[in-house]
Amino acid sequence: MDNRPVGVYDSGLGGLTVWREIRRQLPEESLVYLGDGKNCPYGARPADEICRLADEAVGRLVGAGCKMVVVACNTATAAAIDFLRRKYRQMPIVGMEPAVKPACLNTRSGVVGVLATARSLDGDLFRRTAARYGENIRVLTAVGEGFVELVEEDREQSPEAVETVRRVLEPMIREGADQIVLGCTHYPFLLPVFRQVIGERGVAVVDPSPAVGRRVGPVSYTHLRAPET
């Protein structure tokens, strides 16, 4: 077994939702977490700036001896994942994919809502995924305005959090969305608020973090298993 750590990187605290899933699913793995709190949030920054910040962060994790890196940030994945995989070809890099597929497969109403940062929603990865799985599905999108700041400032259980989530979520529910995709790793910290706002209306919230955790094990095994002797 390769005992080097797995690096997990995010713009701030959001990637801890992914870190938690990797720890739960792969307790034998050592993990190193890097949160770029100095530059958080990334959502409205230009793509080239996000790419530079992601490069610096991944470079630090490579320098720390990580065997692979999980870019636990949807915005950084959208802006930089192709560049990172080209530059750091010697190691596997796992990114965040929008959980549009399971939402589209499970919707009963034919309407899916996706909450993410502006940069993520503008990215090719989201557009390709929505086009591939969203045929005959109405995909609504909205920026989670203020969500990241609530989490970073430890206000996710405040009355302000309830009103902030309600303001963004209610229009999607009124339009018939029965699946809400959390397209930013900060957003799962607000899950109790989402459930409070949704109540008994039968709307599912899709968190992509468990799926990323499930990907890390096979990628690690495929790329990093020791050669037979």
Where are these regions (language model features)?
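Non-catalytic structural scaffold of enzyme domains
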Residues: 1-225
